[in-house]
Structures are given as C-alpha cells and as structure tokens.
Amino acid sequence: MSNLWNSFEVYNKKKHSSQPGMRGGNHSNVGDTRTTVQYASERYERRGSTASESSTTSNEETPQMVDISKLSQNEFKRLYESTRKGEPNNRVNF
C-alpha cells in the first residue's frame, strides 16, 4: 500500500541523483552551488567581424521607419516583399 502513495510525494528521494554536486536547482551552473554574477565592468565589447559588418550593411538597405501613406504602390510592394524575405509559409490547406 505504501508504493501507491510514493507517487504522490512532493519530494521523492528515489527520483533524484544521490550525488550532491548534481543538485542544481535555480541556476544553470549545475556543478556549482552558487550562481555566478557578471558585473558591467567585466563585460567586453565584441570584436568587429565580417559577419557583424555585413549585418549592419543589410540593415541600411531597408529603411527602419517608413511613412506608408507617402509610398507609391510599387514602392510599397517592394518594401513589403523585402520585409517578408526568408519568412516561412504558414498557409494551411484544407
């Protein structure tokens, strides 16, 4: 009869590891008992790379804020297609 009530226990010791180093509750440092904190002075800026430079140039091609009421139909269509580029097709066919 005791086996039936074991499944309703809040903390079942048999479900968890017996190794004390593997108890990582509310932090991602599973092997450590404390959460590591990184202060703002310890943060380093990223180095310039070709990948980050190419992403900044691609952002310059498409304007971020555009007044849609002042665009012609062709300009709006070109802008609309450029923003949807690479977006998955989520159509559902019945």
Swiss-Prot record:
Composition skew (Low complexity), residue ranges: 49-62
Disulfide bridge partners, by residue number: none
Stretch list, region Disordered: 13-73
Listed Polar residues bias regions: 26-39
Family listed: Belongs to the SPG4 family.
General function of this protein: Stationary phase-essential protein not required for growth on nonfermentable carbon sources.
Entry protein name: Stationary phase protein 4
Organism name: Zygosaccharomyces rouxii (strain ATCC 2623 / CBS 732 / NBRC 1130 / NCYC 568 / NRRL Y-229)
